[in-house]
């Protein structure tokens, strides 16, 4: 009787794996245009998407800008990237910045030609935009797993109308953007996400969701997932313990699955601007450290009811190895050889 019991337990063990073991490789086409060719762990040149899927990555996040001056990250750019991602067998997560450039807590600039004075006009423009994006993917027979309405929007979106001085406007915008996705021609409706920064900060998460839902203009049924960024090098308070508390509270209060949609760990950080969180200081700045960090992070996410996944932000952006942080290198690729690091294999175990 012992052996059947052991065998019956095996599926339960495998079911604990993360649903999304992801990476954001938005810069891939730009890097390739600059002459970069990636190499796998055997030193052989191989398409980055194939390297990733062969090492356990099953979902790719892509940032989408509305009308960038040079075409970077626009809809056509993302269609080209998504076709490759889908052909490699991975799901696609579209991160709509709703801007012509970077959108984050410090800047949420409304796209050129969109209203900055009338909220009804802006909500209609947003609806039509999310509808157009999804319909264009449908026309190209590309499935979309997740769509995020905005990027790191704890300070609002589509400024000035969508600033946090008016949460009713924020709610209207999120509702409208979500329904553009829902009304699209995609065969399977993507999961709709709201994405905030500082995932470890429960007070920040609670205030945003409590306030925006209290307006009545955004319904709980308008979105499916709650996404967070979690960067350990921006605050000593960003402990794994705080992240677990925050994610647990988010899921229990709002009954939505949670995903860590941006994270990094450095292989080199000689002069960090901030002290690292106390429960992470034993992890080395190395490829082995990246593996250890992601394994610990996965334990936190898996330990939360409906904790679905992790996306590593830009592991192969060789021309931007610090990835905007004070650390010198957060990549999973050797900047001198273009060969992936051993840490890329960690996704198989998450």
From Swiss-Prot:
EC numbers, comma separated: 3.2.1.89
First and last residue of the signal peptide: 1-16
Subcellular locations according to the entry: Secreted
The keyword Cell wall biogenesis/degradation is annotated on this UniProt entry: yes
GO cellular component terms attached to this protein's record: extracellular region
Enzyme kind, highest EC tier: hydrolase
Pfam family, one: Glyco_hydro_53
Example GO BP: pectin catabolic process
Glycosylation: residue positions: 128
One Gene Ontology term of the molecular function aspect: glucosidase activity
Sorted UniProt keywords: Carbohydrate metabolism, Cell wall biogenesis/degradation, Glycoprotein, Glycosidase, Hydrolase, Polysaccharide degradation, Secreted, Signal
Catalytic activity: The enzyme specifically hydrolyzes (1->4)-beta-D-galactosidic linkages in type I arabinogalactans
Biological role: Endogalactanase involved in the degradation of plant cell wall polysaccharides, and more particularly of hairy regions of pectin.
Similarity-based family: Belongs to the glycosyl hydrolase 53 family.
Protein name, per record: Probable arabinogalactan endo-beta-1,4-galactanase A
């Amino acid at each position: 009787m012992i052996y059947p019991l052991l065998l019956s337990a095996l599926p339960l063990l495998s079911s604990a794996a993360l649903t999304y073991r992801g990476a954001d490789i938005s810069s891939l086409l730009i890097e390739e245009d600059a002459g970069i060719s990636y190499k796998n762990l055997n030193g052989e040149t191989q398409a980055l998407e194939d390297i990733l899927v062969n090492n356990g990555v099953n979902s790719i996040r892509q940032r989408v800008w509305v009308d960038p001056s040079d075409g970077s990250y626009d809809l056509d750019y993302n269609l080209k990237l998504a076709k490759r991602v889908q052909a490699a067998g991975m799901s696609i997560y579209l991160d709509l910045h709703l801007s012509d450039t970077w959108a984050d807590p410090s800047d949420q600039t409304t796209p050129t030609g969109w209203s900055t004075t009338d909220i009804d006009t802006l909500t209609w423009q947003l609806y039509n935009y999310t509808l157009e994006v999804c319909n264009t993917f449908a026309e190209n027979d590309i499935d979309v797993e997740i769509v995020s309405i905005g990027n790191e929007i704890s300070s609002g979106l589509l400024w000035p109308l969508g600033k946090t001085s008016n949460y009713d406007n924020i709610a209207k915008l999120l509702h409208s953007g979500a329904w553009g996705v829902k009304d699209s021609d995609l065969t399977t409706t993507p999961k709709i996400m709201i994405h905030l920064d500082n995932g470890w900060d429960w007070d920040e998460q609670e205030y945003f969701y409590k306030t925006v839902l209290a307006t009545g203009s955004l319904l709980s049924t308008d979105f499916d997932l709650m996404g967070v960024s979690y960067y350990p090098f921006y605050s000593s308070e960003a402990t794994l313990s705080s992240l677990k508390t925050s994610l647990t509270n988010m899921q229990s209060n709002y009954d939505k699955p949670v995903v860590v949609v941006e994270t990094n760990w450095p292989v080199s950080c000689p002069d960090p601007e901030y002290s690292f969180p106390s429960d992470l200081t034993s992890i080395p700045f190395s490829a082995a450290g990246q593996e250890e960090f992601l394994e610990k992070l996965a334990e936190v996410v898996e330990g939360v009811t409906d904790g679905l996944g992790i996306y590593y932000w830009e592991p192969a952006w060789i021309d931007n190895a610090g990835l905007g942080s004070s650390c010198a290198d957060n990549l999973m690729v050797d900047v001198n050889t273009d060969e992936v690091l051993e840490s890329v294999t960690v996704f198989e175990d998450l």
